[in-house]
């Protein structure tokens, strides 16, 4: 119980409030997670989910079994309103034994992962290597396989290469090989969604995209064969998971923290987004536990957590939930998600990517200042990439995505690869993410107004 004594000694701190934020409450919550009874509980919670069920591809039994398992655990935890809501007509794509082979100037089976959603197709053609996206407008790609060998500038900047199928198909291209979206590789191609299911398309490992680039620069003729056996199947129904801590005064106003439970069909889906799930669960568990002995932690508004399905397929699960609830009696007061690595922030390059008005941003800044006082370095940065909660953000609901400093590059070493395993996380990563999400939920569920 040393942590309790330490907290009592700190009650004399001159920094009990930071604007509208009660720093003593933030300190109590964050220390309970980082140094108290909740330490490492999120990581421990995550282990059976990813080890026992593995990756959780949409429309697969592993996902639906993991949903059932998670719901039962949440009920045992005593949360309010634990239930699932169906998300029908979800895209159902099955990866096959796909191959891409360099035929000229030598024979080499290339290391690829088919881009999600692509239908079966075979094509053999000459390839043209482009180092920049804009070159599609000045290069003859008609009848050719387009190979992109771009330099890494960032995921959101480079995602256009993986999604180029529709545009290059309109120019006559017959196939797409996109350099994987990441700054580092050990022969590890990345998967992800594309833009046209009818054009054979795959992601190349960084090493082999650069190999093809070197061959092209030496004026070698490249001939490549693509054989896609993956296929689209009839749509399925999946489920979002919802659980609450009911508000004591304004239960119809909802503060949302969220992550997604589905993953691609590779690795364990621990990084993307099992860690986010664990952090959200840990934040909710801590607020509930503290509220049982300290009335300050009984939220006035309802704190809701959602584990989304079908995030990897265009946020389809979240979009369906939004459509079902947008005209309901509940009012979403604040929305958030963590889906870019549940890592410990080490510098103020770690951000809360924020959408909202000037007044709301100022209040978010006060929350950040309180986190900093509790040794959690972070800053607020405006940004319109809000993932699963984008629909609410577009409606004007203030929103946040947590992105740790390691989320900009290190996260993409493993993102959408076979290397997405639990051992990526280090001690404290999920705890710190939970402390951030828990602070947001606690403070905003109790403030008077924006």
Tell me the role of every PLM-derived stretch.
Residues 75, 241, 257-315, 437:
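Alpha-helical metal-binding/catalytic segments enriched in His/Glu/Asp
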Residues 25, 105-109, 114-138, 191-270, ...:
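Soluble metallo-hydrolase cores and metallopeptidase-like ectodomains found primarily
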Residues 60, 109-200, 268, 378:
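Extracellular/luminal Protease-associated
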């Amino acid at each position: 119980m040393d942590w309790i004594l330490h907290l009592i000694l700190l009650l004399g701190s001159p920094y009990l409030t930071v604007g509208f934020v009660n720093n003593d409450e933030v300190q109590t919550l964050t220390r309970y997670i980082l140094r108290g009874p909740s330490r490492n509980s999120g990581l421990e919670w995550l282990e059976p989910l990813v080890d026992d069920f593995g990756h959780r591809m949409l429309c697969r039994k592993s996902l639906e079994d993991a949903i059932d398992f998670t719901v039962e655990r949440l009920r045992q935890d005593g949360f309010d309103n634990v239930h699932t809501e169906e998300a029908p007509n979800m895209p159902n794509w099955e990866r096959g034994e796909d191959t891409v082979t360099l035929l000229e100037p030598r024979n080499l089976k290339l290391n690829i992962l088919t881009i999600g959603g692509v239908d079966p197709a075979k094509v053999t053609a000459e390839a043209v290597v482009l180092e920049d996206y804009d070159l599609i407008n000045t290069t003859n790609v008609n009848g050719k396989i387009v190979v992109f060998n771009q330099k890494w500038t960032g995921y959101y900047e480079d995602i256009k290469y993986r999604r180029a199928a529709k545009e290059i198909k309109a120019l006559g291209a017959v196939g797409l090989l996109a350099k994987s979206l990441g700054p580092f590789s050990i022969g590890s191609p990345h998967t992800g969604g594309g833009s046209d299911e009818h054009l054979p398309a795959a992601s190349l490992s960084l090493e082999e995209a650069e190999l093809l680039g070197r061959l092209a620069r030496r004026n070698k003729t490249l001939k490549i064969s693509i054989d896609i056996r993956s296929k689209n199947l009839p749509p399925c129904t999946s489920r979002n998971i919802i659980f609450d801590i009911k508000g004591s005064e304004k239960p119809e106003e909802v503060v949302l923290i969220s992550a997604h439970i589905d993953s691609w069909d590779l690795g364990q889906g621990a990084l993307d987004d099992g860690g986010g799930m664990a952090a959200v669960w840990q934040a909710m568990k801590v607020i509930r536990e503290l509220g049982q002995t300290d009335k300050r932690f009984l939220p006035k508004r309802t704190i809701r957590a959602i584990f989304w399905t079908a995030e990897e397929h265009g946020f389809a699960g979240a979009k369906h939930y939004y459509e079902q609830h947008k005209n309901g009696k509940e009012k979403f007061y604040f929305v958030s998600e963590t889906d870019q690595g549940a890592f410990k922030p080490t510098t103020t390059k770690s951000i809360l990517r924020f959408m909202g008005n000037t007044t709301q941003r100022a209040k978010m800044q006060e929350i950040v200042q309180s986190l900093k006082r509790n040794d959690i370095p972070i800053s607020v940065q405006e940004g319109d990439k809000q993932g699963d909660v984008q629909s609410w953000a577009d409606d004007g609901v203030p929103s946040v995505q947590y992105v740790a400093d390691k989320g900009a590059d290190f996260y993409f070493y493993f993102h959408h690869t076979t290397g997405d395993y639990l051992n990526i996380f280090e001690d404290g990563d999920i705890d710190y993410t939970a402390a951030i999400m828990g602070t947001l939920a606690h403070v905003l569920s109790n403030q008077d107004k924006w």
